[in-house]
């Protein structure tokens, strides 16, 4: 791919995201989603590997179907109510169609099948965009229409996402697939609280974005595409690997790390809403995800590959330090004491 094309595509992604999150009209929001889809496809397929082309094709087909559903939902609502305003989604059929469309775009269960496959075929930094930035516009649409959505349907999808995200990640050896199922599991936590506290759902997404970005950037630094490559990277970048372990534990939601904050606040809010069984179920299902995070963390630091003693520790490293990775990793680990302030601001 032409090197000058990448900045144009990244700017297009920023433009599409900005249009969607700042619009009040359904057609403008749909336009932003389409710009995003068309801008990310060349980034997915830029390696020209058959798997990358396959991933780009799968992504295009699913996103095109979801965008058509968004448009159909808004047209049905406009036909019934005469309103094109995003916040005026009052028609029950339109609400159901929109929930399905956004679930496809986000990769929520039962529309999650495309997401791990697309992530597996993408480069690590494109996978980072797919897991974080590309989820922001559809999530914004859900937040803007949260008062019209069906809480029972979203709770069922959320619990299914937390369950399948945990179960399907258990036997994975590819880091991108592990992070794809991690994303599905986290989306379950966001979806379950969306109707009751949209601000808390947004806070959860922000913290998930920070932690996932730190993991992807660390994996990109050590060029680790599977568990065995993570295993052999300890001798070259010990500090980065130790940091990666802490960020993974934060992503799992262990105290006293940042990732514990959203889980704690969501369980508290669900209990206030008299949804204690749902809170208990999603808390138990997060133990499934904890297992594969622990396995990845164990591979990244504790278990060393068998090799000769003179190769165990290298005093030099060819990898220069990365400031964004350091900042994101620090935020992923140290934000829990600031929970009251962050919750008050958001």
UniProtKB/Swiss-Prot annotation:
Enzyme Commission code(s) on record: 7.1.1.2
Statement: the UniProt record of this protein carries the keyword Glycoprotein: no
GO BP terms in the entry: mitochondrial electron transport, NADH to ubiquinone
Alphabetized UniProt keyword annotations: Electron transport, Membrane, Mitochondrion, Mitochondrion inner membrane, NAD, Respiratory chain, Translocase, Transmembrane, Transmembrane helix, Transport, Ubiquinone
Gene Ontology MF annotations: NADH dehydrogenase (ubiquinone) activity
Membrane topology of this protein: Multi-pass membrane protein
Catalytic activity: a ubiquinone + NADH + 5 H(+)(in) = a ubiquinol + NAD(+) + 4 H(+)(out)
Cellular component aspect of the GO annotation: mitochondrial inner membrane
Annotated TM spans: 1-21, 25-45, 60-80, 95-115, 124-144, 149-169, 178-195, 200-219, 242-262, 274-294, 326-346
Domain of life assignment: Eukaryota
Any Pfam family the entry gives: NADH_dehy_S2_C
Compartments, as annotated in UniProt: Mitochondrion inner membrane
InterPro entries reported for this sequence: Complex_I_Subunit_2, NADH_DH_su2_C, NADH_UbQ_OxRdtase_chain2, ND/Mrp_TM
Principal location: mitochondrion
Enzyme class: translocase
Record's function text: Core subunit of the mitochondrial membrane respiratory chain NADH dehydrogenase (Complex I) that is believed to belong to the minimal assembly required for catalysis. Complex I functions in the transfer of electrons from NADH to the respiratory chain. The immediate electron acceptor for the enzyme is believed to be ubiquinone.
UniProt similarity note: Belongs to the complex I subunit 2 family.
Protein name per the record: NADH-ubiquinone oxidoreductase chain 2
